[in-house]
């Protein structure tokens, strides 16, 4: 199957999956968070997309990824779509009008614009002992001259076990209380509304 056909399958199959979710229930959960909108949606992607992206990320050579070491964190990232075709197909699907409108309804944030430059986005990989220190995300995206409004993470972990660690913690504005600890189960999608002082990370290896 040529690239355009796969792209259309990703988009159509994700949109079909969206229709299986109870959007009103998701909205209630999202907006019931104590300080900011946050939700983890299990099995968000069709399984074949999870498998394709998981294999692509798993087999991506480390020398093709950027080493992320800011503020004591350690992880690897790649948003070069020329060498990750399945990531490219997925990004196109998640940038579609259908998905953006669904995301706007979920979050209540209107006039969302996907970032074509993938600033701070793309595949990310952590190895044993790697950490993501507790932090807040940057707000201003210079490349598009817009403020970040919504963040999304989709997990592609193969056979993740809970005792491996790596759950993503979300804290209160004083970094003292953990509101949510999100397990990185494969295929799950995490969404949150960007606001100042949304501290998150997995500081323990």
List where the protein language model places each region:
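A structural signal for short, well-ordered beta-strand segments and their strand-loop junctions
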Residues: 40, 113-116, 122, 191-192, ...
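Non-heme Fe(II) oxygenase catalytic core, chiefly the N-lobe of the double-stranded beta-helix
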Residues: 55-58, 91-148
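Short, Lys/Arg-enriched N-terminal segments with co-localized hydrophobic residues
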Residues: 1-7
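Eukaryotic charged/polar low-complexity linker/IDR segments
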Residues: 151-153
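Proline-centered turn/helix-capping motifs that create local helix->coil transitions or kinks
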Residues: 61-63, 110-113, 158-162
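Catalytic core of Fe(II)/2-oxoglutarate
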Residues: 140-148, 158-205
């Amino acid at each position: 199957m040529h690239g355009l056909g796969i792209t259309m399958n990703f988009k159509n199959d994700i949109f079909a999956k969206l229709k299986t979710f109870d959007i009103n229930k998701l909205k209630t959960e999202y907006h019931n968070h104590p300080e900011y909108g946050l939700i983890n949606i299990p099995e968000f992607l069709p399984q074949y997309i999870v498998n394709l992206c998981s294999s692509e990320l798993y087999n991506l050579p480390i020398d093709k990824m950027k080493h992320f070491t800011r503020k004591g964190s350690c992880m690897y990232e790649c948003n070069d779509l020329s060498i990750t075709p399945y990531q490219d197909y997925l990004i196109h699907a998640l940038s579609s009008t259908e998905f953006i409108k669904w995301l706007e309804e979920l979050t209540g944030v209107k006039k969302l614009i996907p970032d074509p430059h993938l600033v701070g986005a793309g595949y990310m990989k952590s190895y044993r002992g790697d950490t993501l220190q507790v932090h807040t995300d940057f707000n201003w995206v210079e490349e598009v001259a817009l403020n970040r409004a919504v963040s999304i993470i989709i997990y592609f972990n193969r056979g993740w076990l809970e005792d491996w660690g790596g759950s993503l913690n979300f804290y209160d504005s004083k970094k003292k209380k953990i509101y949510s600890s999100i397990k990185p189960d494969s295929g799950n999608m995490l969404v949150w509304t960007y606001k100042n002082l949304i501290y998150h990370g997995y500081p323990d290896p």
